[in-house]
Design a protein with these regions (language model features):
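Motif-centric detector for short Cys/His coordination patterns
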Residues: 1-117
């Protein structure tokens, strides 16, 4: 069953809910992050992305499968904890970057006009 968020509970903390969109745009994969910070690729149009599957990777991480085909991010427990702790900061930075580049969280629509010949 596809989900639009996951819940995480770390030892001694409350339960945190993280949206699929946030997890997708913050994917730790080289495909998203690049091989250095200046090579990161801004993720756009991910507002409606959902999680199709989650698999444990050993005892240290989760691999999350998204409905847009992205599945190369390995989310370590430390990275997930960082996302929880810094959610507001990272989300604000992401929204600012979208605005700066004139991009959107919405999928880009292709418009096709039909004409009678």
């Amino acid at each position: 069953k596809a989900r639009d968020a996951i819940s995480l509970k770390f030892a001694g903390s409350d339960t945190f809910h993280i949206s699929a969109e946030f997890l997708r745009v913050m994917s730790p994969s080289a495909e998203v992050r690049g091989h250095s910070p200046d090579k990161a690729i801004l993720q756009t149009g991910k507002r409606d992305v959902v999680i199709e599957d989650i698999q444990k990777t050993g005892n240290y991480a989760l691999r999350i499968y998204f409905d847009d085909g992205h599945d190369s991010g390995i989310y370590s427990w430390d990275y997930l904890h960082d996302l929880v702790i810094n959610h507001a900061k990272y989300w604000s930075q992401y929204l600012k970057e979208l605005h700066t580049r004139g991009k959107s969280r919405e999928k880009e629509m292709q418009v096709l006009k039909m004409f009678d010949a």
